[in-house]
């Protein structure tokens, strides 16, 4: 047998294959090829895949072999075989040449063996070489990118140092990293691998340095970032003044003068806390045994009129308990045997006093008292009657204010004692009630931080924050304690977000009112069965939950299951529903603070911040999903959105729903501003920052739309004073958005909303309209009187600034075409012209008016140098007969240190100046604690002796140790210029 036929390919066959390869340019023996070198003309015309054979597979299938034609192409030149055939050399792409040498030389011997070698070794070499080539190209590209990034990083660090630390010596040239050009010069003689490694390490070091520079001012965020008050910080005011250019000083001067005015308003109230009257043995006996008026009917009617309107109080302390306390108090005077009389604890006295103060504060405020006294039929309270209104009508406003001032001094006396040594659960309860009263005053609520802190510490001492301490208690006592702890938890986080203070409670150490604790309570409630609807602790809602929740299974959240159960039905009149929803909101708000604002929160990576914020937003929206339909928070552009004016139901129900919605949108507004307040190296490249900004602004717009048409006369003074914070905060957020980006299309819409809100909701109140009425200038001691005027003044001043910024940047006229708006803004300057004066000139007048710092004390006990309390106030106070046994209450009239010619008592405070008729009414207001008839002048030596801390403020422009001094250290409220819009 011919060995050639068995050992190799037949010569004729080989010649045909060679001819086909020359004709088509394709190797017919290479069956693994993915691409062909030449396709036939028919396949090329039809743009279909050709197998490259002759005739090709497509033409054979179409039975059109005669038309299968390959256009002539130059035949590839045969490569000359090298001497070292067994050695394969790599081309520039790392592909072995051995295969091509053997193929194109026509040597078909051992083709199968050659293919196996390629399969075994050639492909592996190809993959390895190709990977090395790609890595080399990537390294070259990264080297070029690093050069650009290093230049960017260097410029960024230089700008950060120039802006934030221009006066600091801690950054010098020796501490900075080498410049990019120096790095590349040093690495010019290195290998490519060494250069890449060095550049990468250098880039990491520079990014780290940039991050450290960004974090150097994170102390600014310790206070104020999660609050809205930082808009009045020094940095914020300087930024606004710079934005206004040549108009900056004119428009910012009245805002800079406001702290001086606030100090004059706060001084009488501060004096009550830091320098209370001295109490002797007789006065102490009166405070412990007979601190209330002799008229028991007045007390009863005050409770009738206002107790039912304050749903928060009704949750904390049951009305029957309060009435029993006052009944026992007045029964003591009918008991002839002293040993049988009930001795009240200081905590009980503080509780009773706080309730009366809350009621009186509603009566003594001008914008709330008239309608509620003269039109009792409009009230929904079952206890409100015409007889009650007539009884209160016998007590004019001056007498009620005198009583309020007396009870306020008594409450501070009780607080100073029980804040040192607690009397147990009653102390926590009384302090919470006192917090409600102090919180109702916008100007003085900063005192609450200390009271809240003391209250929480006392609550933790008796274990209210740990669920295991409730195991051996009966259901009624355990429910009461959980309710008290809820108030502690609520006020802690509420005050934190309003004032910018850090919360006191560590949530990791709290188990009360957790999901496990709620499940335990529900299990106990199911054993009791239906309970009386009159018992607020065991409402029908609680019974519905106990009978339905345990039948559900597989849920991730017990709280959401509870909301599902009580989603329908008449539940909004039940205080438990508001309490429970506020608990869930407080949880999310607490998590927000601990995830975003604490020092240990991660701030270097914007992505992690965004992920955290998205989770918090999702929690808020999930909560809203399961709320009752009427209470469900909806944005202003939702078709189902309704304002307060369109709400139905009782005033309590309307206020409860409004409170839930305001809290919800306020929290969304604040936390979604946080990414705008920080600077990270990657925040400008993440489009989520725009989404957060839009969510914050939408929430602010929704708040202003919610209160549209809300008449303050329709709400109780307690609720209005608490809720007024939310529209003011939303107003300022939109102000900041417009000033930052006045040329955005949305800025015009936002400005129209601000103007409309100012002309409607923040319109002239009764106090504003009567501030120029000279015959109404009379002494009163309540600090609440000027609160509404201060808010309206702030709103008008900020609107004045934002309109000017918008006009300058858009070349439009807003005020010229709106006479009503002109009058609205002009009223502020007409009524309070002094705050528009030069800061130094206004300061000199304030020195002559305000006098000594309240922290300095009287340098002399000379009656001629002491400010005198209005005699009419003391006279009215004595006529009230506050004590059944002592008609002249010297303590509540303030301890007098001298007397005038008529023998009337006089009160010595820290040195105060005379009444100045040339100053505007915001200074000579009835709430300033001064009267022309009773004030005397202060000499210059006395002023220099006592004008310590306040004098420092006037000279150094920093309110050292004053309540508003923190504003100077708050961050810039307007820092959202990293948006790239």
Swiss-Prot record:
Gene ablation phenotype (knockout): Impairs increased CDR1 and CDR2 up-regulation after fluphenazine exposure. Increases susceptibility to fluphenazine, fluconazole, and terbinafine. Does not affect susceptibility to flucytosine or caspofungin, two antifungal agents that are not considered to be substrates of CDR1 and CDR2.
Regions crossing the membrane: none
Impact upon substituting residue 980 to E/W: Gain of function (GOF) mutation that leads to hyperactivity conferring constitutive high CDR1 and CDR2 expression
One BP term from GO: cellular response to oxidative stress
Biased composition (Polar residues): 1-29, 868-880
Top-level taxon in the UniProt lineage: Eukaryota
SUPFAM superfamilies, per database record: Zn2/Cys6 DNA-binding domain
Residue range(s) of DNA binding per entry: 40-68
GO-annotated molecular function: DNA binding; DNA-binding transcription activator activity; DNA-binding transcription factor activity, RNA polymerase II-specific; RNA polymerase II cis-regulatory region sequence-specific DNA binding; sequence-specific DNA binding; transcription coactivator activity; zinc ion binding
Main location: nucleus
Function as written in the Swiss-Prot or TrEMBL entry: Transcriptional activator of drug-responsive genes including the ABC-type transporters CDR1 and CDR2, as well as HSP12 and RTA3. Binds the cis-acting regulatory drug-responsive elements (DREs) with the consensus sequence 5'-CGGAWATCGGATATTTTTTT-3' in the promoters of target genes.
Protein name in UniProt: Transcription factor TAC1
Gene: TAC1
